[in-house]
Amino acid sequence: MRYIKTISMIALLFSFSVAEDLPLGSSIPMADIKMKDINGRQVSLNSVKMENGLLVNFTCNTCPWVIKWQDRYNELAKASQKNKIGFIAVNTNAGKRDRGEDMKDMKKFAKKYGHDFLYALDEGAKLASAFGAKYTPHIYLFDGNGKLVYRGAIDDNPAKRKKVKKYYLMDAIKAVGKDKSIDLAETKAFGCSIKFPK
């Protein structure tokens, strides 16, 4: 009986299906799905995409790793803008909307950290599921043709900005802006697991 209960609990835990991580070269998934941002606007990935591409940052308000990386978010958004790459942060913790991850919390969080970029809510974590995203933060960078050219982490040291040695995402942004190949197109994303709805 205990064995059956254990199996049932495991089945329940994995009842929300998440796709495999989006392969490099893939097109933007669910590019036209509408999401509400903290300013009340309806936005889609296609509406955010610019001439040279799109950067999607799956993030949240409550993950300690996200908070550690906050001092780099605006810089990355500005670099994206400079290189004609659209930038959007997407709150995908649909399983914690009542615990610090609803729209009101997003507005407070953005104000606290001085966000200067789009921050939208992923209803039901549908977008994150389509991407196969599993962590916050989890980065996906697309080129001007809407093809995935980088995925993974922001850099190699979330805890201390001054000790970063490898600027994975910044290097990728600059390469895309200059229409050059990315030296390291895939890194291991790490952070908190996305809280998908049950």
Residue ranges: model-predicted function:
Residues 60-69, 139, 192-195:
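Short, thiol/selenol-centered motifs that function as redox-active sites or metal-ligating centers
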Residues 141-198:
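Thiol-/selenol-based redox modules, centered on thioredoxin-like
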Residues 50-54, 82-87, 114-118, 144-145:
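Loop/turn elements at helix/coil->beta-strand transitions in domains of secreted/extracellular proteins
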